Amino acid sequence: MALSFFGGGGASHLKYFDIRLDEDYIVFRGGEQEAASAQLSGKLLLCLSEPLSVKHVRLNLTGISRVCWHLPSSSATGGRKSWREKVFYEKSWTFRDAGKSKTEILAAGNYEFPFHVILEGSMPESVEGLSDTYVTYRFKAEIGRKYAKDIVVRKPLRIIRTLDSSALELSHAMSVENIWPNKIEYSISTPTKAVIFGTSIRVDFKLIPLLKGLKIGQIVSQLIESHDLTLNPEDPDSVRNTYKNTRTIVNDEHELDEEGNLEIIDEAAEGYQFSRFLDLPKTLTRCLQDTDTRGIKIRHKLKFRVQLLNPDGHISELRATLPVSIFISPNLAIDDNNNLVDQTPQSAQRAVNDLAQQAPPLYGEHQFDQLYSEVDPSGYRTPGPGSGPGTPFGTLSRNLSAENLASMNALTNTDISASALHSRLSNLHASRFSNPSPSDADGHTDAEYRRLGVSTDSFGPSSGSNSQSPASPELSRRPSDEGYHDHDYIPSGMATPFHPQFAEVESLSRVPSYSTAVRSSVGPCDSELPDYQAVVAEDTAMPTLQSPQQAHIRSVGRGVSTGHTGIDVHHLRSGFFNSRTSAHHDDDDRRLRLVQARARV
């Protein structure tokens, strides 16, 4: 910063005093009601070659809006000026404060005073380019001194409100098309309604004469900017003091070559089809962005005039208008004089390409989102520690047939060998062939589950649910449904150990191998699965039970219709458990018939 900007009397002690922002401008994406907040941060830099006595070191950010217009003078009265200025935003930072009527000495050296603030997305955007009407933000850094003039440095801040990548203006084409009877069929369109400031507007024309001998004359395309200024925008419409004005931003005149431009359009008629490009100014003093804030409303539209030279000699004129929206792109930097920094056509084309390839939302623009590297992964990664009891680990759920037990030592890191596991499983199957008393069965069940690490509390296995029927390895692929109906109320995972038990997972995942399956008898293809009545009819010596049979209980418990509706499941279970000891052998025979019927399918 040049020293001429400082006051005298000790200002020469300052080698450097400036406001440095992390970002040159603040960008809001979307309207005032939808845009997210943005963070403004930077540093106040101070370099002293000698000690300096100061009262305070402060930084202020001020937002000011001003609306002003001049009415033209007449012969009777002179010109009249209407204006209003208001401060709508203020933020202050105090870095040094010696107190009232006191000073402190800043030693020679370099100083950095960081600052930051969150700017709401509803804040007005910067509007600059008009002589007496604007919305601006300015920083003011001040070093207060007691017996000398304060040292002050200023810096402007630009807030840009651009369109969100999902805005309809970026995807909707604008067109006007109609038929002038016995004159011309026309279509005038633009690819998008939104246009980046400093680029160009493409206009597509399609003109088809309907009158023989009709010729197209001069075609005029204009970009019109309208200003709607209001001194008191917060008041009702009836009492607002407003002023409206328009100006022409771009004027393009074009004449067709009657011979060269004539072509066949849509394989139906002869006409003219061409495009015109309207280059926008590179400075805000000649063209503003569309806005509506703080009593300043700027809008743009395209106006077209097409001369039609009739065969009888008179001239007709076709007129049409199209609305367009001009917005400032963050990819095209604007300097303090409101001019584009890079005004080359290549820069404008890059901005258009970046907008077309933009994938919403831009990752770099979300400054307040927590980065993935800063997120605690606990609770997000799966499977969690609690999912192990009910989930096979790795390859342990595959190829665990009786013939493949020898290879399990290579798949697990447990201390249980394959032979030991095979022996335990054999003992477990052998114990199921025996017919212990109910008390013995209960004790055996508790011991087995304690050995396997399974709790026998109210959520664990009960004595009534442990089936005493034989279970063969060959039929272990189809899970048996008998004897487990009384656990339908237990949630999944409540009866399994919390910590992973690899040996239990292996035993539960044990399935017959392919060679075992092919040795099984195959029933005829046209045979159907026997129903419940067909299987029960084969048992002529079946004793009468005090309650429905176990298979019937399971069907009712699972919601399968059996012809007995409205039965209380709880009472059915109690009746079955009371008669379980007396009908045990008959139940085994009945299950065997069920298994044989399934094998024939």
From Swiss-Prot:
GO molecular function: protein-macromolecule adaptor activity; ubiquitin protein ligase binding
InterPro entries cross-referenced by the UniProt entry: Arrestin-like_C, Arrestin-like_N, Arrestin_C-like, Arrestin_domain-protein, Ig_E-set
Family the entry assigns: Belongs to the arrestin family.
Annotated source species: Aspergillus fumigatus (strain ATCC MYA-4609 / CBS 101355 / FGSC A1100 / Af293) (Neosartorya fumigata)
UniProt xrefs under SUPFAM superfamilies: E set domains
Annotated Low complexity bias: 455-473
Descriptive protein name: Probable HECT-type ubiquitin ligase-interacting protein creD
Gene3D superfamilies in alphabetical order: 2.60.40.640
